[in-house]
Curated annotation (Swiss-Prot):
It comes from Homo sapiens (Human). This is Solute carrier family 35 member F4. The chain crosses the membrane at residues 160-180, 192-212, 248-266, 277-297, 301-321, 330-350, 365-385, 395-417, 419-441, 450-470. Belongs to the SLC35F solute transporter family. Its main location: membrane. It is found in: Membrane. The keyword GTP-binding does not apply. Putative solute transporter. GO terms for cellular component: membrane. Pfam families: EamA (PF00892). It is a multi-pass membrane protein. Residues 261-321 form the EamA domain. InterPro entries: EamA_dom, Solute_c_fam_35_mem_F3/F4.
Amino acid sequence: MDELLLDLFHKLTSGRQLAAGNGLCGISHKEQEVWKPGHNILVKMRKEDKSLVWLIHSTLARYTQVTNFLGTSRSSVTRCKPGANCPSSHSGISRQLSPLSVTEDSSAPILELQNQGSSGVCGHRVERQNRSADDGTQTHSENSSQENRIKARCLSCTSMVLKGIWGLLIILSVSSSWVGTTQIVKITYKNFYCPFFMTWFSTNWNIMFFPVYYSGHLATAQEKQSPMKKFRECSRIFGEDGLTLKLFLKRTAPFSILWTLTNYLYLLALKKLTATDVSALFCCNKAFVFLLSWIVLKDRFMGVRIVAAIMAITGIVMMAYADNFHADSIIGVAFAVGSASTSALYKVLFKMFLGSANFGEAAHFVSTLGFFNLIFISFTPVILYFTKVEHWSSFAALPWGCLCGMAGLWLAFNILVNVGVVLTYPILISIGTVLSVPGNAAVDLLKQEVIFNVVRLAATIIICIGFLLMLLPEEWDEITLRFINSLKEKKSEEHVDDVTDPSIHLRGRGRANGTVSIPLA
């Protein structure tokens, strides 16, 4: 730029000297060809010959314009983003073919590279920061979700373990109470045979079911309720209005009669048959419940339960055949089957009219049955006493210990059945009931009251298998298929692992020997 100014200054001074030498006093005009900065065309400008000061000022103005042009070109170059097309390359204005334009063109790529480098580094830093922030939040969310999953699994595992423990205890308690009730009845029959009085006496103990439930409520509940308030809350099983006299007679009477009839027939069967046979035949009530539910309630038809019902009927016939169709044996089988049938009818009617009930409602209902039995059924043992059908000499001669033990175990059995539904799985209650069969068999063998032949043993096993088939859920076939498919997948995965392990071993040996072996697998 300095050289350009000196050039212009020498030309102007030489022109002024030439004009003075020629004696030109007027205004002389001189044509000069110059490159105008920032344009592509050659501009011819005529300027008047003025004073040196005016030329210097004009030259300084030109210098200022050239400097501004350089600033704008640099800013336009440095503002170009990496990878983008610079607008100066597409504009209609080209650079001057001068040393200044050459230096500008040569410096532009350097500026662009510097700008690309700086912007690229900054971009990479920003991207790395964003990625690290995203990775941090994602890792934190994954860790929190994984912790929540672990906690949920631990809670579910804990609840399953607790339910399993409670289920095991309730299975043992249910089977023990039922075996104890049956064996105490057999012992009582040696000195006292009044089955209806025993049924009436044990049913009266059901009144204590609700007080036992309320005692548990006071011991475990955080918000205590008064007995009347809790009684009214549990009486909703009879309807929104609670327990009225009309509902008491309408709902309680048929269920109380069925309850009494079930227990009375069971006690009659124990007089004719052994405890093992009666308990095995009573397990047929599951098959009768399915048949009545299918006919009355229009429940889903299941082929496996039909098979279980057929097995139960087969076991009944074989049990009657075990003693060569002896009269007492046939009558005892009829009593036991009648007890199982009335029990099934009780359950089906309860489901039809009252639906499902929680623990408090069940306690209220059973206590109501005991209260109805005490008021309305008490005349029956009185009539049997005076007609000498069930007669005893005096109340002091009654076996009160056996009677209270039988009634207490029967009440415990009913409480455990309803508590078990709350604390554990309902299927375990049924398993506890069917386990009473081998329990009674063990006691009978110890007492040497029964000799098991092949027919009786086969009948007992068939009835128990049919009872267990009744416990299968409705989607048992789908669950079985899923289980089989999962086993197949596990076997296939193990086979793949067994195939890949030798390949890894071969690769390790090949690399150790300096060669690479490719297994066929």
